[in-house]
Amino acid sequence: MLKIVSGDIIENAQKYDVEAIVNPNNKYMDYGCGVCGAIYDAAGIEQIETYCHNKWIKDMEVNEIRITPGFYLQKEIIHIYAPIFSQEKNPIEKLKECYLKLFEKLIEEKYNSVIIPSLATGFHRL
């Protein structure tokens, strides 16, 4: 079942009791602005950054997905580095690929309920 809602992503994650939340992250997996910042604030900035920097040495590639614990958020966090409009030759195709990879990962990991914000529409300007 698909349900489309608007509002605060953190409040909705609690309200709808989802298993995971998708984080449109930056390639460094550092605290960011917008949705990424809200997720890091809810999860615990120090906890999540320490976990990410200890687990992965390399920066994320466009459309790469990494999964972490949610710490204080108590939901798994599915990080995806979406395309940045100004850095892509064909940004719309890259964005389609981004969503496709995300849905494939959700099926692979057997998630039943996930909050997904609009990807690449804030800082990434798609």
Predicted regions and their residues:
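Phosphate/ribose-phosphate-bearing ligand recognition and processing surfaces
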Residues: 83-126
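Extreme N-terminal starter segment of soluble prokaryotic enzymes
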Residues: 1-4
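N-terminal short beta-loop-beta anion/metal-coordinating cradle
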Residues: 50-75
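Conserved, mostly hydrophobic/aromatic
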Residues: 22, 78, 116
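Short, basic/glycine-rich phosphate-binding loops at helix/coil junctions
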Residues: 72-86
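Conserved acidic residues
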Residues: 18-19, 75, 112
